[in-house]
């Protein structure tokens, strides 16, 4: 019997594993067993550890949460004074088992002699609010039980330092290296102390947060606050709080997508939880049509991602993260006086903001992919500079360094609706506003494509290295008829860039699954010509790497 089968048998016969998990184990197929019972330690991705709720060392279950929490607390202990009692915030989103996993995390924290703070009544909490409370209320760190916009059967484990910023790779690698082998998670003995668990005053936290959020506004007037706006929280943490916040700001015509604006752990009326995809908007568009509304705003289930769509000439335009980042930067730099302004974005996000920043005396700081890098960059830069916006090509942004260190749907809603009202005053649309930016700085075309490939090697990461080497060693001087002026592999970020005379395509592989991501940033041409160029380049590389056989 191989090692994995022995581990399966161990789980099936272990007294700490309940009947429900044992039944789930019996229903697993071979590939699921390989994934869930691997003896490797879990991997932290761009936003924590995420996987489906399932048995095994890599499923999200009470054992894996206890194991990861133990490692996290030990890491935070190591960077604090010895024997100091630490304070941790523990929160969860609206997903299944959130309450159970939260209780498990608190049990580990209190067993280790520290204090755990939770929201009253086990209330689901938005990710930006978690970061805010850690940042503002003096916590040693925090654990967020969330899988953000992942499929409904997933859950996750997200960890923060005392500033409310996510831990970086070097820190999570240290966390994992100090943990024993994964097989130990079944035998972890806990002695929880309920006296070490404290509840927060939810109302007090919300009201303080709203007051702080209001400060992100640039021009705080009441013009057009009766603007019709359809809102969906996709059955997540913002379903009540966002509407309450917008009313606090004075908006009087917020139209709620009722089926998607209540806590539903099954997400029955929200089949897709990622606002980046158009099918996520179908129900909200029906509400917009019924109420003759031309704006829809949406937050993903943990309310870090924020998206906005606008009806133009009977067609919906879904603003990308690149577009809202550029719009926010341009608007704020035009209407606010800054001392040493800066923008933070990732290496794969649009360089249009570099041109905007240059005109207004701002600088752009680039980071690796993932908002954890943006959050930590803000920690460093905010000491002597003033944030304009932090954003990435995946929807979502932060507009203030005084609130938190996460993408924040509430900040984004406040500012982008202000900009939408400003456009209404000018008798233009939000899309017109973006086009004016392009008319000043030149057309930019951005596109992100995630392409799966069929891995044949046992270790698909080795196959990834081979593909990258193939691209580098091809010594390409042109791609699909376009001259190559640069080929560069950044060894810190593992992002491979092919530069052209009018922009670039960058490649990045997922750290957790065999997928290759293409990021395009092209300029100097009409939108149609740039889109055509991107498609030609994409097709060339798909054929070169034989990805069409995926």
UniProtKB/Swiss-Prot annotation:
<dbReference type="InterPro" id="IPR005843">
    <property type="entry name" value="A-D-PHexomutase_C"/>
</dbReference>
<dbReference type="InterPro" id="IPR005841">
    <property type="entry name" value="Alpha-D-phosphohexomutase_SF"/>
</dbReference>
<dbReference type="Pfam" id="PF02878">
    <property type="entry name" value="PGM_PMM_I"/>
</dbReference>
<feature type="binding site">
    <location>
        <position position="304"/>
    </location>
    <ligand>
        <name>Mg(2+)</name>
    </ligand>
</feature>
<dbReference type="InterPro" id="IPR005844">
    <property type="entry name" value="A-D-PHexomutase_a/b/a-I"/>
</dbReference>
<feature type="binding site">
    <location>
        <position position="302"/>
    </location>
    <ligand>
        <name>Mg(2+)</name>
    </ligand>
</feature>
<dbReference type="Pfam" id="PF02880">
    <property type="entry name" value="PGM_PMM_III"/>
</dbReference>
<dbReference type="InterPro" id="IPR016066">
    <property type="entry name" value="A-D-PHexomutase_CS"/>
</dbReference>
<dbReference type="GO" id="GO:0005975">
    <property type="term" value="P:carbohydrate metabolic process"/>
</dbReference>
<dbReference type="GO" id="GO:0000287">
    <property type="term" value="F:magnesium ion binding"/>
</dbReference>
<dbReference type="GO" id="GO:0006166">
    <property type="term" value="P:purine ribonucleoside salvage"/>
</dbReference>
<feature type="binding site" description="via phosphate group">
    <location>
        <position position="148"/>
    </location>
    <ligand>
        <name>Mg(2+)</name>
    </ligand>
</feature>
<keyword id="KW-0413">Isomerase</keyword>
<dbReference type="Pfam" id="PF00408">
    <property type="entry name" value="PGM_PMM_IV"/>
</dbReference>
<dbReference type="InterPro" id="IPR005846">
    <property type="entry name" value="A-D-PHexomutase_a/b/a-III"/>
</dbReference>
<dbReference type="Pfam" id="PF02879">
    <property type="entry name" value="PGM_PMM_II"/>
</dbReference>
<dbReference type="GO" id="GO:0004615">
    <property type="term" value="F:phosphomannomutase activity"/>
</dbReference>
<protein>
    <recommendedName>
        <fullName>Phosphomannomutase</fullName>
        <ecNumber>5.4.2.8</ecNumber>
    </recommendedName>
</protein>
<feature type="binding site">
    <location>
        <position position="300"/>
    </location>
    <ligand>
        <name>Mg(2+)</name>
    </ligand>
</feature>
<comment type="similarity">
    <text>Belongs to the phosphohexose mutase family.</text>
</comment>
<dbReference type="InterPro" id="IPR005845">
    <property type="entry name" value="A-D-PHexomutase_a/b/a-II"/>
</dbReference>
<feature type="active site" description="Phosphoserine intermediate">
    <location>
        <position position="148"/>
    </location>
</feature>
<keyword id="KW-0597">Phosphoprotein</keyword>
<keyword id="KW-0460">Magnesium</keyword>
<dbReference type="InterPro" id="IPR016055">
    <property type="entry name" value="A-D-PHexomutase_a/b/a-I/II/III"/>
</dbReference>
<dbReference type="InterPro" id="IPR036900">
    <property type="entry name" value="A-D-PHexomutase_C_sf"/>
</dbReference>
<keyword id="KW-0479">Metal-binding</keyword>
<dbReference type="GO" id="GO:0008973">
    <property type="term" value="F:phosphopentomutase activity"/>
</dbReference>
């Amino acid at each position: 019997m191989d090692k994995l089968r022995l581990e399966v048998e161990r789980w099936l016969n272990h007294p700490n594993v309940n009947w429900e998990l044992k039944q789930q184990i019996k229903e697993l197929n071979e590939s699921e067993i390989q994934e869930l019972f691997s003896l490797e330690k879990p991997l932290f991705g761009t936003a924590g550890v995420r996987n489906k709720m399932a048995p095994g060392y890599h499923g999200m279950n009470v054992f894996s949460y206890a194991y990861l929490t133990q490692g996290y607390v030990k890491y935070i202990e190591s960077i604090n004074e010895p024997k100091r009692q630490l304070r941790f915030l523990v929160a969860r989103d609206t997903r299944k088992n959130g309450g159970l996993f939260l209780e498990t995390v608190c049990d580990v924290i209190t067993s280790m002699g520290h204090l755990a703070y939770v929201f009253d009544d086990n209330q689901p909490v938005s990710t930006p609010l978690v970061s805010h409370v850690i940042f503002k209320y003096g916590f040693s760190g925090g654990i967020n039980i969330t899988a953000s916009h992942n499929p409904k059967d997933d859950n996750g484990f997200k960890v923060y330092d005392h500033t409310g910023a996510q831990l970086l790779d070097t820190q999570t690698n240290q966390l994992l290296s100090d943990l024993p082998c994964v097989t130990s998670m079944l035998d972890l003995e806990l002695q929880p102390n309920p006296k070490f668990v404290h509840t927060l005053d939810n109302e007090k936290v919300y009201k303080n947060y709203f007051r702080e959020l209001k400060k992100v506004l640039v021009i705080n007037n009441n013009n057009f606050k009766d603007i019709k706006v359809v809102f969906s929280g996709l059955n997540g943490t913002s379903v009540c709080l966002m509407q309450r916040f917008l009313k606090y700001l004075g908006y009087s015509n917020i139209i709620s997508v009722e089926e998607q604006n209540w806590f539903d752990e099954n997400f029955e009326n929200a089949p897709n939880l990622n606002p980046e995809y158009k099918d996520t908007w179908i129900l909200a568009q029906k509400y917009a049509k019924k109420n003759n509304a031309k704006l829809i705003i949406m937050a993903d289930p943990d309310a870090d991602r924020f998206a906005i769509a606008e009806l133009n000439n009977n067609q919906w335009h879904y603003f990308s993260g690149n577009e809202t980042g550029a719009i926010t930067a341009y608007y704020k730099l035009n209407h606010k006086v800054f001392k040493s302004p800066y923008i933070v974005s990732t290496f794969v996000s649009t360089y249009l903001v570099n041109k905007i920043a240059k005109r207004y005396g701002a600088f752009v700081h680039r980071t690796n992919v993932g908002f954890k890098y943006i959050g930590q960059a803000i920690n460093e830069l905010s000491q002597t500079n003033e944030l304009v916006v932090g954003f990435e090509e995946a929807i979502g942004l932060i507009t203030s360094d005084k609130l938190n260190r996460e993408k924040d749907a509430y900040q984004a809603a406040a500012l982008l609706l202000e900009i939408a009202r400003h456009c209404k005053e000018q008798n233009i649309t939000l899309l017109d506003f973006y086009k004016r930016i392009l008319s000043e700085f030149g057309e930019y075309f951005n596109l992100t494509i995630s392409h799966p490939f069929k891995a044949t090697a046992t270790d698909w990461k080795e196959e990834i290295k081979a593909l990258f080497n193939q691209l580098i060693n091809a010594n390409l001087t042109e791609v699909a008829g376009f001259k190559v002026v640069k080929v560069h592999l950044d060894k810190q970020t593992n992002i491979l860039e092919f530069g052209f005379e009018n922009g670039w395509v960058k490649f990045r592989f997922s750290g957790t699954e065999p997928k290759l991501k293409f990021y395009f940033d092209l300029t100097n041409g009409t939108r149609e010509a740039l889109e055509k160029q991107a498609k030609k380049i994409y097709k060339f590389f798909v054929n070169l790497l034989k990805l069409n056989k995926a």
